[in-house]
Amino acid sequence: MLSLGVSIFLLVFLIPENSGLECYQCTWMKNSQSPDNCYKNLPNATACAKDMIYCVTDERYEDDEFISIRRFCSSMPMDGRCTEVGKAKDCKYSCEVDACNFSTSIEPSKVFVFSILAMGLVLHT
């Protein structure tokens, strides 16, 4: 019988993940007439193109006031930092799990989390 550590290793690394990432994809601006379908009330997550492997949240502030948010798929990771130009600030966060761009918190990848758990179990036994 396989040990729990070996079973987790096989589960994480040998079973392929879903081939397509799903992210929230929408835009909301404070002064727009559009309904709030991206800030507090999110639409359903939708499939990204195959080369898009990150979900991104892009928040914009002006004079420290929240003015817009954009959620989208990306082929490049964002560093989770904010850049400031004058009174404007732009903060971009990325993650690698389906529908993970629902907030500004960065969610660790599934492989990373399971790897840490598997290592802990192997070292513990």
UniProtKB/Swiss-Prot annotation:
The record, for PANTHER family, names: ATILLA, ISOFORM B-RELATED-RELATED
Q: What is this protein called?
A: U-scoloptoxin(05)-Er1a
In its UniProt entry, the species of origin is given as Ethmostigmus rubripes (Giant centipede)
Q: Which domain of life is it from?
A: Eukaryota
Q: Which GO terms describe its cellular component?
A: extracellular region
Q: Does the keyword tRNA processing apply?
A: no
Q: What else is known?
A: The scoloptoxin-05 family has remarkable similarities with the three-finger toxin family commonly found in snakes.
Determine if Thylakoid is one of this entry's keywords.
Answer: no
| PTM statement from Swiss-Prot or TrEMBL | Contains 4 disulfide bonds.
User: What sections of the sequence does the record tag as coiled-coil?
Assistant: none
CDD domains cross-referenced by the UniProt entry: TFP_LU_ECD_Bou
